[in-house]
Amino acid sequence: SQKRWLFSSDSCKHCKDAGCLNACPTKAIVRTDLGNVIVQQDTCIGCKFCIPSCPYGVISFSEQSGTVHKCTLCNDRIHNGLGTACSKACPTGSIRYGELGDLKNRADARLAQLKARGERAQIYGYREADGLQVFYLFADLPHIYGQPENPVVPQRRLVLCSLVTILAALGIGVAALVNFRERLQGTEEVHHES
């Protein structure tokens, strides 16, 4: 088999059903009017609940700021009509920003060309995780590019259950500490009476 180079960018997919947004207890992660998902740094408490809620692993925690960070789809730029920095800087024109319908039409046409040449090409992002705002035209299977074949967005119920489990564990810890202190005070009183 012949070896070949395959390239792909990897950043936030701005999921239509964003697990990170659903998991954030302070609502620091929001969807803008243009559909991109951003972290409001002034509201983020650094709890990291969003990190395991992202099936793509593209959210990181900054020890320096104590908050999470991810691609904003160049929120400031797109709200000023400038497009994304990555699409402007891409030397091959492979990364594009624009109207979703136009981009899908271009991708579908290119996919048809690649398939006609016998390529194993596919579009990733139309159906994955209930649809992504960022999609890819891959020349091979998604896992070759480091993407999950069948990404699953954690259900809100699971995130809530995790939170309940954490709170229950904290409650048990506090109860054990109170019990220990009461027992310790009880033994001190016995020693004083003797």
PLM features: residue spans?
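Non-ligating segments of multi-cofactor redox enzymes
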Residues: 1-194
